[in-house]
């Protein structure tokens, strides 16, 4: 499944635009491949939506994926972009991410993904600790990236992640 289940990721803000690819076709190993074992999964910080504030989210796919992930104790930052193509845009996030370093509004929420090795021992998941289990992580990605995994494929993926 991990090398053969085809995925087409389109219109995912923070991913397709960050990589300059309107469509990303591949499999799980397109990003989580052997050269990246032991390192961050991708060398580029990406915004996959885990730090978005659900009550302010306008992207239906992010909102659906965030529905299960709530961390009420985290502050929500309101950021008004002052320069570049996002000037005047107001964004809400629980983790400013790379923007704290770069000062760029486009970097809000962008983070480097952690390595997958030893994942089962590192709960809770995501930078904000919003997912308590690997099942919640898999469900988030399945909804966020419209992967279309069956219940059996999700269970298989969780079992695989636990084995790393």
What are these regions (language model features)?
Residues 1-130, 136, 147:
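Short glycine/threonine-rich turn/loop motifs
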Residues 13, 133-136, 152, 156-159:
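Extracytoplasmic/secreted proteins, especially bacterial periplasmic and envelope-associated proteins
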Residues 25-26, 153-156, 164:
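Loop/turn elements at helix/coil->beta-strand transitions in domains of secreted/extracellular proteins
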Residues 121-122, 140-143, 163:
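Short, well-ordered loop/turn and helix-capping segments at boundaries between secondary-structure elements
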Residues 144-151, 161:
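Long, low-charge, small-residue-enriched segments that form tightly packed helices used
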